[in-house]
Design a protein with these regions (language model features):
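Mg2+/Mn2+-dependent nuclease catalytic core
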Residues: 64-99, 103
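Conserved catalytic cores of phosphodiester-cleaving nucleases, focusing on short active-site segments
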Residues: 25, 44-70, 74, 93
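A cross-family signal for key residues in well-ordered alpha-helices
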Residues: 23, 94, 132
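Short acidic/glycine-enriched loop/turn segments that link adjacent beta-strands
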Residues: 39-42
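Acidic-basic catalytic patches of nuclease active cores, encompassing PD-(D/E)XK
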Residues: 1-35
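Domain-level recognition of nuclease-like catalytic cores that cleave nucleotide substrates
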Residues: 102-137
């Protein structure tokens, strides 16, 4: 598989994971304010509001061939999508968050959350693990 094909598949998996996360948040009562907010120094996957708090959501998605492989990976504690949110990524996110807050003149409380999505595209199956406030106070 060529590098461009791999990147295209990775982008498709990521977009599918973000769509799943948006639907999950809506079902939980969040209002989606923005998606794929992009600056040259970074991107925020989802910006959502729940009551008086803005949630900046980083979505991490991993794809499996079958539900059996997904369940085996989960039960054995192998690679988890949320582990891919490094300190460097959080620093970049903070800079983009500052831009979003300035542009939208928001003085609401805010936090960074992670939505870890595992998908089996062929079987149209997905799971989501939502980790609120990954930085903490």
């Amino acid at each position: 598989m060529k590098q461009s094909q791999k990147q295209g598949k990775k982008n498709q998996v990521g977009a599918y994971g973000e769509e799943i996360a948006v639907n999950y948040l809506k079902k939980q009562g969040f209002v989606i304010l923005d998606t794929n907010y992009l600056k040259k120094w970074g991107e925020i996957d989802i910006v959502a509001r729940e009551t008086s708090t803005i949630h900046f959501v980083e979505v991490k998605t991993v794809s499996y061939e079958t539900q059996h492989l997904l369940k085996a990976a989960v039960s054995h504690g192998t690679w988890r999508p949320e582990e891919n949110v490094s300190n460097h990524k959080l620093i970049k996110l903070n800079r983009v968050i500052e831009s979003w807050l300035l542009e939208h003149q928001s003085d609401l409380d805010w936090q960074i959350d992670v939505a870890a999505v595992r998908i089996v595209p062929r079987e149209k199956y997905a799971t989501i693990k939502y980790l609120p406030n990954v930085i903490g106070d």
